[in-house]
Swiss-Prot record:
GO cellular component, one term: 9+2 motile cilium
Organism of this sequence: Homo sapiens (Human)
Record's keyword annotation contains Plastid: no
NMP 1: annotated span: 87-113
Protein name per Swiss-Prot or TrEMBL: Adenylate kinase 8
Tissue/organ expression: Expressed in respiratory cells (at protein level).
SUPFAM superfamilies listed in its UniProt record: Microbial and mitochondrial ADK, insert 'zinc finger' domain (SSF57774), P-loop containing nucleoside triphosphate hydrolases (SSF52540)
Length: 479
């Protein structure tokens, strides 16, 4: 980029590189850590931070009333995410920590640990290698606003906070059937989650303090504290109903912790819409262009415009149009490159449809540097496609378009003169759909982070799903 020439134009490769490698988020995380820890020499600190490479490890807090299942969900998440579980019990059982020994002594006397001591235990545990490299999950901590503020003061910030919720009557009834395996720490229930193995059944123990009165007292204290804890975690907190099967709660929690929060990183949408003929790609592209000022790039329309304008490429394309043959990929990509390299596409972003039709075209797009950052597959059943396309008609006198089911002509006279576009004939539609589905599996494999949508619903409902997929960051893929 020549510094002596104005106005400056940023090459499209620069923002694309920054976006793909999360440069903005990396710099933001380093700045946050610098402000939190305030090291005397920032350079070695930043180098150490980069070596850790732990910006995206799980940092999760799970809160909830007694018997809501938070410990079970926390243990399942730990196994799935390979993270460290931090509970009050395992924090005070650390035999190599003087702080833990003192906390254990106080806990045996008072059945509670002072907030300052508990937060010190958490700080010591989070400084260990497994928590730094693999992440952590706090189970039932913080319990009070004081604990939440002390944790925040030390710069310990979770990425996701989950609060489980259920009616008190359900929790009291559930707590009465609670059983614990003393060997593994696994929690079972006499009604909802009874182990099939007789060996485990025989060693299960009834925990203390699960009577109806004691549970009600704990619930009262929880409700008094949680309303003051929740405001400490705006924008990163999700409430999940615990009054449903444990597996459903787990999958909702897992989906949430795999999601990424919206950032202030600059983002230029490069949207690719894929789907069979008649799936609504053109309509969705027009809606996106209208609302977000994206450049609507329709491959077929570009080719027609090139022919109509009698450009150099248009003259090469015209013979293929006249013979009703497919335009070669090399020529098609040159026309497409010419459009996507224009400044409006670089600055505003684009929504592309009509290409790629197969894996070769997709690889060509990638090699040319036109990598979409959002890909959507619009799935529509075969019968719905046939209904949408084969019943379309046009009035040759007025040019008005009709649909025999959704927008029938007002009079018999108009209906008698309606014509069908040859492209909407049943055989033509079947051929196009067959061609798409032959290549769709390869395209789905190539675009692994693509979002699949049900296109057989109201167009504005589909648009809302697409809009949500563009605005929100893509979820993390955790094996």
């Amino acid at each position: 980029m020549d510094a002596t020439i104005a106005p400056h134009r940023i090459p499209p490769e620069m923002p694309q590189y920054g976006e793909e490698n999360h440069i903005f988020e990396l710099m933001q995380n380093m700045l946050e850590q610098l402000l939190i820890h305030q090291p005397e020499d920032p350079i070695p600190f930043m180098i150490q931070h980069l070596h850790r490479d732990n910006d995206n490890v799980p940092r999760i807090v799970i809160l909830g009333p007694p018997a809501s299942g938070k410990t079970t969900i926390a243990m399942w998440l730990c196994k799935h995410l390979n993270s460290s579980l931090l509970t009050l019990e395992n924090l005070i059982l650390n035999e190599f920590s003087y702080t833990a020994t003192e906390a254990r002594r106080l806990y045996l006397q008072r059945k509670t640990v002072p907030s300052a001591l508990l937060v010190q235990l958490i700080q010591e545990r989070l400084a260990e290698e497994d928590c730094i490299k693999q992440g952590w999950i706090l189970d039932g901590i913080p319990e009070t606003r004081e604990q939440a503020l002390r944790i925040q003061t030390l710069g310990i910030t979770p990425r996701h906070v989950i609060v489980l919720s259920a009616p008190d009557t359900v929790l009291i009834e559930r707590n009465l059937g609670k059983r614990i395996d003393p060997q593994t720490g696994e929690i079972y229930h006499t009604t909802f989650d009874w182990p099939p193995e007789s060996e485990i059944q025989n060693r299960l123990m009834v925990p203390e303090d699960i009577s109806e009165l004691e549970t009600a007292q704990k619930l009262l204290e929880y409700h008094r504290n949680i309303v003051r804890v929740i405001p400490s975690y705006p924008k990163i907190l999700k409430v999940i109903s615990a009054d449903q099967p444990c597996v459903d709660v787990f999958y909702q929690a897992l989906t949430y912790v795999q999601s990424n929060h919206r950032t202030n990183a600059p983002f230029t949408p490069r949207v690719l819409l894929l789907g069979p003929v008649g799936s609504g790609k053109s309509l969705q592209a027009a809606l996106l262009a209208q609302k977000y000022r994206l450049v609507n790039v329709c491959c077929g329309q570009l080719l027609k415009e090139a022919v109509a304008d009698r450009t150099t490429f248009g003259e090469l394309i015209q013979p293929f149009f006249e013979k009703e043959m497919a335009v070669p990929d090399s020529l098609l990509m040159k026309v497409l490159s010419q459009r996507l390299d224009q400044q409006d596409c670089i600055q505003k972003g684009w929504v592309l449809h009509g290409v790629p039709r197969d894996l070769d075209q997709a690889h060509l797009l990638n090699r040319l540097g036109y990598n979409p950052n959002r890909v959507f597959f619009l799935n529509v059943p075969f019968d719905s496609i046939m209904e949408r396309l084969t019943l379309r008609r046009i009035d040759p006198v007025t040019g008005e378009r009709y649909h025999l089911m959704y927008k029938p002509p007002p009079t018999m006279e108009i209906q008698a003169r309606l014509l069908q576009n040859p492209k909407d004939a049943e055989e033509q539609v079947k051929l196009k759909m067959d061609l798409f589905y032959r290549n769709s599996a390869d395209l789905e494999q190539l675009y692994g982070s693509a979002i699949t949508l049900n296109g057989d619903q109201d167009p504005y409902t589909v648009f809302e799903y697409i809009e949500s997929g563009i605005i929100n960051p893509l979820p993390k893929k955790i094996p």
